[in-house]
Structures are given as structure tokens and as C-alpha cells.
């Protein structure tokens, strides 16, 4: 629930960009297009703004596990979801940033267990002991195969009378208080509408005169096949901004 607009992020960004092993890279010819977004981001890198974002992120995330439980009631998840927690580790080089995150989560009432090197080794004995400390969230869960879970949810949605249409939506507006979607040849009226198009959502929200500062972020991952047994749960290396998750038949590095 700690947002990216931390007060210390601006001092970290230059080092992230300079380092070839850093977690951040920019496509330089895209920078001019990013300037309006970046200006708004910098303006929000203040403690009161950070805490505002963290507070409302926490309210959403705090409801996520019960919400998933409700969705999962009608589908068979055997072997697809594991309840083994999530582990964050770090070195003393980034201790100031980690202390800030711990403090914020404490203020929000997040349950967290600080762990020392011995406790980290007990949890994940195959990790090279480069770490100086960490935090463990024992109630967290992870998916072994997100695609299989989504397919099961989709099939249940169709079974319960849901409809799936693949259309090019041209516009979104309102008929009174009811949202309306318009494709090239059809018009749909709904009681409620969720716009969930990822980076392309802005094309539709702009038509509603909602100026959302949404931009794109490209992420990469690597599969290490046959290595899912090396760790028992997701492990995040906070210094470098990447994580590893044991999944079906492979270890995923993000």
C-alpha cells in the first residue's frame, strides 16, 4: 500500500537511470510526451500526498483477499493458489527507504513481521545470504497459474449468463445517468460500467472529460524453467525493484 510518489523517490531516480542494473529505464524519445505526467507526479511527491494515496490504496488492497474469496467460491482452485505469504528483503544500502515504507504501513495498520537474516534463511534457505533484513506478510497468497484461474472465472461468468463481445468501441457517454458504449454499428446501455483497458483506458476516459494522468509502463519477465522448487513463496528484492515467484513449472523473475 506504499505508493510510488514517496518523498525520497526523486533522489533515487537518477541512480536508477544511470545504473545498467537499475529497475528503471526511459525511452528518451518519449520523454517530451511524458513531461506533463512527470510534472504532476513531482508535484505529488510530498508527504501529505503520499499518505493520501497510500491510505486509499490500502483501503482497496485490504478488501482484495475477501473479494477474491467471493469470486473463487464457485471454481476449483486446487493447486492454483498457495497461501505461503510474501517476503521482501533488502540490504542496508536502502535501509532509509525501507524504514519509511515500514513506518507508513504501521500508520495504516498493516500487519507486517520484520525478519532478520536468520529468519529469512529459515523461510528461504536457497536464497544467497546477501540480505541484511526484510519483512514478511504471512497472510499473502500467490497464483501458480494466473491464466488458468482467469479461464475458470471466465467460463463461470459465461455459465451464469454473462456475454462476451469483441468490438471496437468508438465512444462512451451517458443517456441521462446511464453509461452508453458505442461501437461502429451498435449502442449498449448499462446500469454500471467498468473501463478496464489498461493503458488504453485513457482514450475512453478522455471522452468523459476525465483528465486522468495515465501513461504506459513496459515490464519484462524471465522464466527459469524447472526452478519453481527453489523458493516457497514470492520474494521481492527491494533494493533492485524486482521479484521472483514460484509458478507452475518455472520460477518467474519480474
Language-model segments: which ranges?
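Dinucleotide-binding Rossmann-like beta1-alpha1 core, especially the glycine-rich loop
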Residues: 2-117
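Active-site substrate-recognition segment that forms the wall
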Residues: 5-43, 171-174, 178, 187-252
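Short, flexible turn/loop "capping" segments at secondary-structure junctions
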Residues: 80-81, 128-130, 245-247
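Extended hydrophobic/aromatic segments used for targeting, binding, or gating
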Residues: 97, 112-131, 139
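Helical element adjacent to the flavin cofactor pocket in flavoenzyme catalytic cores
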Residues: 100-106, 130-183, 188-192
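Residue-level signal for well-ordered alpha-helical positions
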Residues: 101, 126-127, 207-208
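Conserved beta-strand segments of alpha/beta enzyme cores
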Residues: 111-113, 163, 211
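Alpha-helix N-cap/helix-start capping motif
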Residues: 117-118, 147, 198-199
Amino acid at each position: 500500500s506504499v505508493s510510488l510518489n514517496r518523498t525520497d523517490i526523486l533522489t533515487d531516480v537518477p541512480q536508477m537511470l544511470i545504473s545498467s542494473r537499475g529497475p528503471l529505464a526511459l525511452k528518451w524519445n518519449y520523454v517530451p510526451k511524458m513531461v506533463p505526467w512527470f510534472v504532476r507526479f513531482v508535484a505529488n511527491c510530498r508527504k501529505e500526498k503520499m499518505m493520501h494515496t497510500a491510505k486509499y490504496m490500502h483501503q482497496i488492497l485490504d478488501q482484495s483477499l475477501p473479494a477474491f474469496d467471493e469470486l473463487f467460491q464457485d471454481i476449483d482452485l486446487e493447486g492454483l493458489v498457495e497461501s505461503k505469504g510474501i517476503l521482501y528483503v533488502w540490504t542496508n544500502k536502502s535501509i532509509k527507504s525501507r524504514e519509511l515504507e515500514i513506518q507508513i504501513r504501521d500508520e495504516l495498520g498493516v500487519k507486517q513481521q520484520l525478519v532478520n537474516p536468520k529468519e529469512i534463511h529459515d523461510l528461504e534457505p536457497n536464497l544467497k545470504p546477501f540480505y541484511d533484513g526484510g519483512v514478511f506478510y504471512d497472510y499473502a497468497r500467490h497464483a501458480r497459474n494466473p491464466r488458468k484461474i482467469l479461464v475458470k472465472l471466465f467460463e463461470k461468468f459465461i455459465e451464469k449468463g454473462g456475454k462476451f463481445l469483441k468490438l471496437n468501441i468508438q465512444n462512451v457517454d451517458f443517456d441521462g445517468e446511464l453509461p452508453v458504449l458505442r461501437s461502429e454499428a451498435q449502442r449498449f446501455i448499462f446500469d454500471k460500467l467498468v473501463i478496464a483497458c489498461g493503458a488504453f483506458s485513457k482514450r475512453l476516459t478522455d471522452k468523459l472529460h476525465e483528465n486522468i494522468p495515465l501513461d504506459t509502463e513496459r515490464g519484462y519477465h524471465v522464466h527459469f524453467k524447472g526452478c519453481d522448487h527453489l523458493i516457497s513463496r514470492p520474494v521481492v528484492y527491494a533494493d533492485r525493484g524486482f521479484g521472483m515467484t514460484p509458478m507452475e513449472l518455472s520460477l518467474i523473475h519480474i
